[in-house]
Amino acid sequence: MNVLSLFDGISTGRLALEMAGLKVDRYMASEIERAPMEISAANWPDIVQLGDVKHIKAADLPKIDLVIGGSPCQGFSRAGRHMNFDDPRSALFFEFSRIVAELRGRNPGLLFMLENVKMKKEWEAVITETMRVQPLHINSSLVSAQNRPRTYWTNIPGVTPPEDRHIKLGDILEPDIDTGGYIAENGLLFDPSISQKARRLVTSENGEVRIKQATRQGYIVAEDGDGINLAFPTSKTRRGRVIKGKSNTLDCACEGQVLKNGIVRRFTVTELERLQTLPDGYTKKGGATKGERIKAIGNGWTAAVIAEIFKKLK
C-alpha cells in the first residue's frame, strides 16, 4: 500500500497502520515543522518527506492508495476563536481536497481519511459537501483516557465508532511522581507550574476537593483520578471544569491537570503519550525539547482511533 499523509505531524498515521496490521510499501508525508519531522524520522526512517502541501502535485507522485490527514484545526476550535475558513490554517483543508481530487483522476479507487475537531454545523457542511461523504463523530474516550471529540470524513467502507474500552485516567498515570518543589495550599499539593489564580479555583472542604464554577452551587467535586481544567481562572462563565475519570482534550499546550492522592498536577510527557495511545517514549526519539514534544502530542491524533478506522482496510 502506498500512503500519502498530509499535515503529517509525528506520523501517527504510520503508527496506526502498523497497529492495524497493514503492510505499507511507501509512506510519503507533508510536514513543515522541524520537531515533528525529527520525531517521525527517528521512529520511521523510511518516510519520504515532500515538504509544503501547497507544492504537492499528483503528477509528481506514484500511484497512491490512501490519503490521510488532519488539516490544521485552529480556526475551527474554541481555542482558535472560531475563525473558520477565514483562518489560513483551516483553509488548508482545500489543499487536502485538491490533492485528493487530482489523485482520483489517476486512481478512481483512491481511499481517504480526513480528521478535524468538532465544529459548527455550517463549517462541517462545507467539508462534507466537498469530500462527498458523511462525517463520523468519534470521541477518543472510547479507546483512551482522554475526552477528545473529533470528526472524521472517510470513504473507507464500514467504519463505525469503536467499542468502549472503559479506560480511566488511573489506568495510565505514572505511579511515582517527584513532588519536590510542589506548593502546599488549601490542604492539597499543587504542581508549581499551576498559577496562583488557577490554584484559587481548588479548595479542600469537608473531605471534598471542590473546583469553583460559575454555577448556582458554585463548585463541582473532583475525585481521585479525575481530570481537571483550570485554564480559565478569571472567566466569569467557564472557570474550572472536572472530567470524570478522563483528561480534558489535549491541545498544543496540554494545560489540563489531574487530581491524584491529594495532588493537583499537570500530566507528564509519558502520560500525554498514553492519552494519545502512543508508545511510551515515542516523542522522545529525535531530540525534541519537552515543550516541542508536548505541542506535537497535543496537535496529533489518538493512534488507537485511527487504527480502528484502518482495520476496515483489511
Can you say where each PLM-predicted feature lies in the sequence?
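Conserved active-site and SAM-binding loop architecture
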Residues: 1-314
